[in-house]
Swiss-Prot record:
The keyword Ribonucleoprotein applies. It comes from the Archaea. GO terms for cellular component: cytosolic small ribosomal subunit. Belongs to the eukaryotic ribosomal protein eS28 family. It holds the Pfam family Ribosomal_S28e. Transmembrane segments: none annotated. It comes from Methanothermobacter thermautotrophicus (strain ATCC 29096 / DSM 1053 / JCM 10044 / NBRC 100330 / Delta H) (Methanobacterium thermoautotrophicum). PANTHER family: 40S RIBOSOMAL PROTEIN S28, SMALL RIBOSOMAL SUBUNIT PROTEIN ES28. This is Small ribosomal subunit protein eS28.
Length: 68
């Protein structure tokens, strides 16, 4: 994982997916070209504020979840 970029989860927004297994989070890039940038990403599995994600791609951003 030499090319992965660390990002800290700063806020857990919503749950999504068929059974709520995916969480949408806001995370701050900690290192690299986009240091300090805040992204919205979809994450599978248990996650909470303060966790560190290793992102392979810092360009993609998740779309906002719309509820009817």
């Amino acid at each position: 994982m030499d090319d992965a970029t660390p990002a800290e989860v700063i806020e857990v927004l919503k749950r999504t997916g068929m059974t709520g297994e995916v969480m949408q989070v806001k995370c701050r890039i900690l290192d690299g070209r986009d240091k300090g940038r805040i992204l919205t990403r979809n994450v599978m599995g248990p996650i909470r504020e303060g966790d560190i994600l290793m992102l392979l791609d810092t360009i993609r951003e998740a779309k906002e979840i719309r509820t009817p």
